[in-house]
Curated annotation (Swiss-Prot):
It comes from Photobacterium profundum (strain SS9). Pathway: Amino-acid degradation; L-arginine degradation via AST pathway; L-glutamate and succinate from L-arginine: step 2/5. Substrate binds at residues 19-28, 110, 137-138, 214, 252, 362. This is N-succinylarginine dihydrolase. The active site is at E174, H250, C368. The keyword Hydrolase applies. GO terms for biological process: arginine catabolic process to glutamate; arginine catabolic process to succinate.
Length: 444
């Protein structure tokens, strides 16, 4: 049965702010305490989603988390009314409050790992929410993420949902930001490519020294087992620890792949040639590797431009489109090399630029904002149709953003108890628009 790749982008939440919470993410740290614009951020994301839908692609939406997360603050000892909890946290633990206000769930590449039915033993699409243990502000996402995924992909005849891996560093799982699937046609049994930063149970292997390796080898193995994948169609590779120490905190900051194309930097992986050899053997056929040398683009340029944090998409006419953030065009070296790649006709046919400045300032480019889900025709029909982008939904969501979102949010605004009221009102309305049911704690 014919299958297509759908992209489910994260909707930016009403509390989008720059609190510098992500150690190892250069942009996040650099822009700490800057004023954010949640309304603009949400609309930039919606514009990208609508553009892809207008290209004839399947584009879905994943709802944001409930923030401020008063429930987590209560678990941490803050008591009284919601307003009292916010007030106490602002005075006693402002960094904890900031973490509980993060809108980082917009980056749905970290929401989960997804395996299509063509790859799994039971013939279902499998979802495992990422535990994101390395960062507190993200580690509190996975329960709600699981409920949102189950409300979006509800049909048990087609979709299998797992719990997140144990929430300890040994099984640190960053989701699809460290996962790519290669194939020749989407409906064929593909090769799933997992990338990790370190071994948790074996210190003999190299690891980064400056910044944390967020994803473990053991987490990759666990997801392979949960999703019932076969070993001859799986490749597990280690990310180069040296580039993690230069700000490449996920593999999708240094590599992107789709179908039979891998686009990556020459320093992306440990033992890179061996990785290429295994991928080439397992994918078979015409597997294309587009490698960018350091002499053309440094790691620093890759990180600041987010060249590889791009979307590699097959268009309805069969051409391959590379979706890039505007920052790539603003970097002369990067933009020149992009033109070289296009002109060489190595497997990427066209480029499209999007303005995602609000997300980029927190360290999230086009690839961060989307979760890829390969679906056959029956599975696509089984998806919650209210979450699929079209003209009507685009207009409804823009009106919703105008009604509920602030133009600016600063660190000081996070202490405003009214932010809880506004955010819950927004999310309550959103669950009705997207037909999600009661996925949030305040609704349960």
């Amino acid at each position: 049965m014919k299958a297509r790749e759908a992209n489910f982008d994260g909707l930016v939440g009403p509390t989008h702010n720059y609190s510098g919470l992500s150690f190892g993410n250069v942009a996040s740290e650099k822009n700490q305490a800057n004023q954010s614009n949640p309304k603009q951020a949400a609309k930039q994301g919606l514009a990208k989603m609508k553009a892809l839908a207008d290209m004839g692609l399947v584009q879905g939406i994943l709802a944001p988390q409930e923030r401020p997360d008063v429930h987590t603050l209560r678990r941490l000892g803050f008591m009284g009314s919601d307003a009292n909890v916010i007030e106490q946290a602002a005075k006693q633990a402002p960094k904890v409050l900031a973490a509980c206000c993060s809108a980082s769930s917009m980056w749905t590449a970290n929401a989960a790992t997804v395996s299509p039915s063509a790859d799994t033993a039971d013939g279902k699409v499998h979802f495992t929410p990422a535990n994101l243990t390395n960062k507190f502000h993200r580690s509190i996402e996975h329960e709600t993420t699981g409920r949102i995924l189950q409300a979006t992909f509800a049909d048990k005849n087609h979709f299998a949902h797992h719990s997140a891996l144990p929430a300890v560093e040994h099984f640190g799982d960053e989701g699809a930001a460290n996962h790519t699937r290669f194939c020749h046609q989407y409906d064929e049994h593909g090769v799933e490519f997992f990338v990790y930063g370190r071994h948790a149970f074996d210190s003999r292997y190299p690891a980064p020294k400056k910044y944390p390796a967020r994803h473990t080898f053991e987490a990759c193995e666990a997801v392979v087992r949960l999703h019932q994948l076969t070993s001859d169609k799986v490749v597990i590779a280690q990310q180069n620890p040296d580039v993690i120490d230069q700000g490449v905190f996920h593999n999708d900051v240094i590599a992107v792949g789709n179908k039979n194309v891998l686009f990556c930097h020459e320093q992306a992986f440990l033992n890179q040639q061996a990785v290429y050899k295994e991928l080439t053997a397992k994918v078979g056929g015409n597997f294309k590797i587009i490698e960018v040398p350091t002499s053309a683009i440094t790691i620093e340029d890759a990180v600041t431009s987010y060249l590889f944090n791009s979307q590699l998409i097959e268009m309805p006419n069969g051409e391959t489109l590379l979706i890039l953030p505007e920052e790539c065009r603003n970097n002369e070296r990067v933009w020149a090399h992009v033109q070289t790649i296009i002109n060489a006709k190595q497997g990427i046919d066209k480029v499209q630029i999007f303005d995602l400045k609000q997300s980029m300032a927190n360290g999230g480019g086009p690839a961060c904002l989307r979760l890829r889900v390969v679906l056959n025709e029956q599975e696509l029909q089984a998806v919650n149709q209210s979450t699929l982008m079209n003209d009507t939904l685009f207009n409804r969501l823009n009106t919703w953003v105008d009604s509920h979102y602030r133009d600016t949010v600063t660190d000081a605004d996070l202490a405003d108890p009214q932010l809880v009221v506004e955010s819950r009102a927004a999310l309550d309305a959103l669950t009705q628009i997207l037909d999600l049911g009661s996925v949030y704690a305040f609704q349960r």
